[in-house]
């Protein structure tokens, strides 16, 4: 990518997300999504190779299809209700089409097949933007229409997403695909609580972005893209050895780390609404998610399956780029649970 074009591309992505999040008119919300999509394609093809080109094409086709469904829903909603405001999606069929379009953009099951493939075909930092920043604009639209969405449809999509994300990551050795399937699972949890408490969805999204950003930065520092490379991190960057397992455990939702907080609050929200079956199913399925994180943690330990690790520690440490925000992110990733009473007061 041309260095002179980078500020324009990233500012367009930022502007598109901001327009969608702050817009109260359906047309401008759609324009913001289109700006965001078109500006993000050069980010995916930062390294020009057939794999990144394939990932960009898959991303474009999926997002363009979702945008077409969204535009159809906007026009039908205007014809039937005469309203252009984003908070007024009163028509049942229009609301259903909007949810389907946003589910495609967010990578929810059964529209999730593009997420692992696109993430795998991009560099680590582009994958970070795909799994974090690119969820803000669709999530803002879902937040605005949360009062008029079909609860049964959202719960069905959420449980399918949790199942697809947890099951799909079991046989993966590529770290980017594992994080992509983890993203599908987290989006399922966010959407499940949206009809009951939209603010809880925002809290879940914030914590998810913190956890995922920390994980990608650690993997980028160690240049690890597979479980085999991750197992050799300890002899290159010894200080990463305790940080990567704790971050992965938090991302998997193991108490008492930060990742357990959103799941705990969401389960509590369901119990307040006298629904015990749905959170039980979600929690049981998510245990599969925690399993493949435990497998990754075993790979970063002293042993390497199925034999002991004979790799010697390097006497000279490798130079790494300074990451001033990483200590703060690691602290938030592991120690945010103790301040949960304050968060409950705010919500």
From Swiss-Prot:
This protein's membrane topology, according to the annotation, is:
Multi-pass membrane protein
Report keywords, A-Z. Answer: Electron transport, Membrane, Mitochondrion, Mitochondrion inner membrane, NAD, Respiratory chain, Translocase, Transmembrane, Transmembrane helix, Transport, Ubiquinone
Q: List its EC numbers.
A: 7.1.1.2
GO biological process terms, semicolon-separated: mitochondrial electron transport, NADH to ubiquinone; mitochondrial respiratory chain complex I assembly
GO molecular function annotation: NADH dehydrogenase (ubiquinone) activity
Which EC class does it fall in?
A: translocase
Asked whether the UniProt record includes Transcription among its keywords, one would answer: no
Q: Where in the cell is it found?
A: Mitochondrion inner membrane
Q: Where are the transmembrane segments?
A: 13-33, 55-75, 96-116, 123-143, 150-170, 178-198, 201-221, 247-267, 277-297, 325-345
State what this protein does. Core subunit of the mitochondrial membrane respiratory chain NADH dehydrogenase (Complex I) which catalyzes electron transfer from NADH through the respiratory chain, using ubiquinone as an electron acceptor. Essential for the catalytic activity and assembly of complex I.
In which family does this protein belong, per the annotation?
Belongs to the complex I subunit 2 family.
Known PANTHER family for this protein? Answer: NADH-UBIQUINONE OXIDOREDUCTASE CHAIN 2
Return the protein name.
NADH-ubiquinone oxidoreductase chain 2
Q: Name the species this protein comes from.
A: Gorilla gorilla gorilla
């Amino acid at each position: 990518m041309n260095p002179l074009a980078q500020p324009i591309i990233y500012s367009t992505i930022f502007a598109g997300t901001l327009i969608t999040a702050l817009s109260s008119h359906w047309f401008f919300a759609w324009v913001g999504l289109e700006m965001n999509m078109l500006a993000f394609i050069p980010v995916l093809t930062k390294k020009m190779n057939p794999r990144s080109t394939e990932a960009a094409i898959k991303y474009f086709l999926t997002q363009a299809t979702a945008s077409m469904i969204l535009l159809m829903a906007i026009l039908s909603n205007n014809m039937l209700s005469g309203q252009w405001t984003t908070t007024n999606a009163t028509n049942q069929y229009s609301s259903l089409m909007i949810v389907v379009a946003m589910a495609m953009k967010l990578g929810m099951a059964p529209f999730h097949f593009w997420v692992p493939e696109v993430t795998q075909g991009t560099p680590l930092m582009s994958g970070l933007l795909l799994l974090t920043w690119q969820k803000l604009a669709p999530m803002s639209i879902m937040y605005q229409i949360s009062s008029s969405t079909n609860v049964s449809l959202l719960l069905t999509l959420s449980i399918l997403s949790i199942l697809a994300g947890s099951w799909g990551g079991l046989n993966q050795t590529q770290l980017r695909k594992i994080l992509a399937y983890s993203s599908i699972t987290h989006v399922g949890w966010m959407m499940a609580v949206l009809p009951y408490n939209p603010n809880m969805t925002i809290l879940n999204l914030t914590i998810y972005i913190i956890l995922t950003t920390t994980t990608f930065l650690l993997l980028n520092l160690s240049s690890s893209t597979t479980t085999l490379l991750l197992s050799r991190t300890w002899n290159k960057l010894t200080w990463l050895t305790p940080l990567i397992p704790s971050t992965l455990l938090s991302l998997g939702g193991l108490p008492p780390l930060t990742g357990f907080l959103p799941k705990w609050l969401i389960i509590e929200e369901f119990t307040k609404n006298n629904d015990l079956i749905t959170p039980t199913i979600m929690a049981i399925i998510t245990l599969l998610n925690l399993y493949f994180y435990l497998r990754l943690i075993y790979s970063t330990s002293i042993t390497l399956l199925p034999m002991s690790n004979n790799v010697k520690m390097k006497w000279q440490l490798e130079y790494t780029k300074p990451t001033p925000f990483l200590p703060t992110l690691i602290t938030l990733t592991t120690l945010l649970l103790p301040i949960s009473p304050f968060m409950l007061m705010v919500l």
